[in-house]
Amino acid sequence: MEDEVVRFAKKMDKMVQKKNAAGALDLLKELKNIPMTLELLQSTRIGMSVNAIRKQSTDEEVTSLAKSLIKSWKKLLDGPSTEKDLDEKKKEPAITSQNSPEAREESTSSGNVSNRKDETNARDTYVSSFPRAPSTSDSVRLKCREMLAAALRTGDDYIAIGADEEELGSQIEEAIYQEIRNTDMKYKNRVRSRISNLKDAKNPNLRKNVLCGNIPPDLFARMTAEEMASDELKEMRKNLTKEAIREHQMAKTGGTQTDLFTCGKCKKKNCTYTQVQTRSADEPMTTFVVCNECGNRWKFC
């Protein structure tokens, strides 16, 4: 059963990526006949795939059936709150056609009641960790929420992770607004920098960490450019800082004046050099050269 649902999910994800929902209606009809459980929903992420099809499709029959499926699956997350509710749920199939959608929903619901509490606690961390962002009617804020959600859709990671990119975009915007309390230039620059970093093709890990909740929305809203940078850029900055410190130390300690080196810029031979052990002890020392005429610097091993 799980393999079949996973196969449906993969087909729908490909449809979304190719922006071609042909055949989606047949898949949705087959899904409707599968007795869904909370465990199956969580393990296959089929809900995210169906929701993505719903958003993209212009076919009213497809969107209507997708909405119906999502609505029925959401009932699995709620569960009856009392024993009385449970008894009522068990009695309802007796007065309902056995093959009707309602009967299948109730059958699935009653079959999973005993494990509901444990399964509810085991829901995806992302869904339960953060409260939903308050709604707003401010056109600037709404536009920023849309752009943040679009940035989170970069690379389609949100489909594989199963994140609600629209809600997450709203939470990030809400955190930014709560800190700045205005939609002025500071607010817009903050939003713009988040969007730029989320779309950065060289820094996909940042987007994935935000989508899966490793970086909470309120923390992401406050992160500096240095904190959002890719690991590669952080390493480059670290090396540049080390080299700047080394060159500063060289300038303070001086060096040995020589005419053995020719400056690549001014072609003069009035230079000062310093040798520093930058690698392991058995490796050659690095020679740093400064042209005393034009200030050009270079190094070699």
Swiss-Prot record:
Residue ranges of domain TFIIS N-terminal in the record: 3-80
Cross-link type Glycyl lysine isopeptide (Lys-Gly) (interchain with G-Cter in ubiquitin), residue numbers: K55
The family this protein is said to belong to: Belongs to the TFS-II family.
Function: Necessary for efficient RNA polymerase II transcription elongation past template-encoded arresting sites. The arresting sites in DNA have the property of trapping a certain fraction of elongating RNA polymerases that pass through, resulting in locked ternary complexes. Cleavage of the nascent transcript by S-II allows the resumption of elongation from the new 3'-terminus.
One Pfam family recorded for the sequence: Med26
Annotated zinc fingers (TFIIS-type), start-end: 259-299
CDD domains xrefs: TFIIS_I (cd00183), Zn-ribbon_TFIIS (cd13749)
Modification type Phosphoserine: residues: S57, S81, S97, S100
Subunit structure: Interacts with EAF2. Associates with UBR5 and forms a transcription regulatory complex made of CDK9, Pol II, UBR5 and TCEA1/TFIIS. Part of TBP-based Pol II pre-initiation complex (PIC), in which Pol II core assembles with general transcription factors and other specific initiation factors including GTF2E1, GTF2E2, GTF2F1, GTF2F2, TCEA1, ERCC2, ERCC3, GTF2H2, GTF2H3, GTF2H4, GTF2H5, GTF2A1, GTF2A2, GTF2B and TBP; this large multi-subunit PIC complex mediates DNA unwinding and targets Pol II core to the transcription start site where the first phosphodiester bond forms.
Keywords noted in UniProt: Acetylation, Chromosomal rearrangement, DNA-binding, Isopeptide bond, Metal-binding, Nucleus, Phosphoprotein, Transcription, Transcription regulation, Ubl conjugation, Zinc, Zinc-finger
Positions carrying N-acetylmethionine: M1
Residues binding Zn(2+): C263, C266, C291, C294
Record's miscellaneous remark: S-II binds to RNA-polymerase II in the absence of transcription.
Associated disorder: A chromosomal aberration involving TCEA1 may be a cause of salivary gland pleiomorphic adenomas (PA) [181030]. Pleiomorphic adenomas are the most common benign epithelial tumors of the salivary gland. Translocation t(3;8)(p21;q12) with PLAG1.
GO term, biological process aspect, one: transcription by RNA polymerase II
Boundaries of every TFIIS central domain copy: 140-256
A GO CC term assigned to this protein in UniProt: nucleolus
Record protein name field: Transcription elongation factor A protein 1
Keyword Transmembrane (UniProt): no
Region entry Disordered, spans: 80-137
Gene name for this UniProt entry: TCEA1
Keyword Zinc-finger appears in the UniProt entry: yes
Localization per record: Nucleus
Biased composition (Basic and acidic residues): 80-93
